[in-house]
Amino acid sequence: MIRSSTGRVAAIAIIFLFIVALFQNNDTGTYAFLPSLSQSSKLPSYPPTWLRERMALSEKSWKKSVELREKMAQSHPANPKIPFFPTDFLKYPFTIWDFFPATWTCPHDFQRVGRLGDGGKWVCGMSIYESLPEPKPISAEAVEVREAAIAAAESGLVIYSFGINGESSFEAEMLERVPSARIWGYDFSVDGWGKQIPMTERHRTFFKKVGLGKDDEHDASPAFWTLPALMKENNHTYIDILKIDIEGSEYDALDTFMDAFDGIQSASGKSVLPIGQVMIELHLGNGDSANEKVDFDRFRKWWERLERMGMRPAWIEINLFAVTLGSNKSNPRCTEYVWVNAKDERSVLWKQ
């Protein structure tokens, strides 16, 4: 009886384990007995299947918008010198921003970070960033030396912020919600971060009173640095999040950045910008003067080079302050975009 009972119990246990193993499935949808052993024998797919499928749908939507962009541009007789804000609506029912819609959908959550008005930003995959483990504590020496890069430069989530102007609600919330976040800030017009960042979090930030520019002019007043030079100074090869609002200087500054990585193997891939995502405010004139530095042709070539190097428009928010403030009303010449790097091989967004 004892032997018989023991045998029945063992048989039931074996059957139970088999059923549990049967319902354990891997990312590709196949089943495996003892899945922990079978999965350890091969690397997981990258990105996961569900994520690749969502990204493929986004890429398809974006490519369609690129085709429509070309057709719409060809329909205007002044192409490539198309006015930013045509006055004949019946003939040309579009503005500059309609050529560059946010057609690439973030496959993760999209959350507002920072205040709801000017200064706050939309972030693709905020929950992914929140889930990242906190890096090792920063040494006391690194905290004291504020004109030196933070120790263990690339540990944690690396954020660069250009154009602070005394408003740091975005940075403050990122520090509060993302334990791994480390932020490097630059602005030649202010002396430091806004009051929104509490002193208890300042040890995770670094500030330098310089501007972001096309050329390195470190001895000028004010001083300007290029983005590649700042990354080298900080011992960085990759930026997870780039926030940039530099009042029209973004075109030349990002040209220099693209020059540094076009045709080069970076942390993200060949001819791919080593940035996970970008929150940027774009500034334009009215686009109707021969003296303007950025016209439609210049803007489109600049934009499409960014796309070629991985960037995809995932969010757009028209800044209406120029339209609504004051007595001298203006066209909507400033617009916030979120670009997500769809080609980036290093982004934490594609590993979840």
Where are these regions (language model features)?
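Conserved acidic-Pro-Pro-aromatic motif
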Residues: 179-181, 232-242, 248-352
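Conserved SAM/SAH-binding loop
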Residues: 210-215, 225-227, 246-248
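N-terminal signal-anchor transmembrane helix specifying type II single-pass membrane topology
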Residues: 1-48
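Conserved S-adenosyl-L-methionine
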Residues: 163-164, 243-245
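N-terminal accessory regions of S-adenosyl-L-methionine
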Residues: 29-128, 132-139
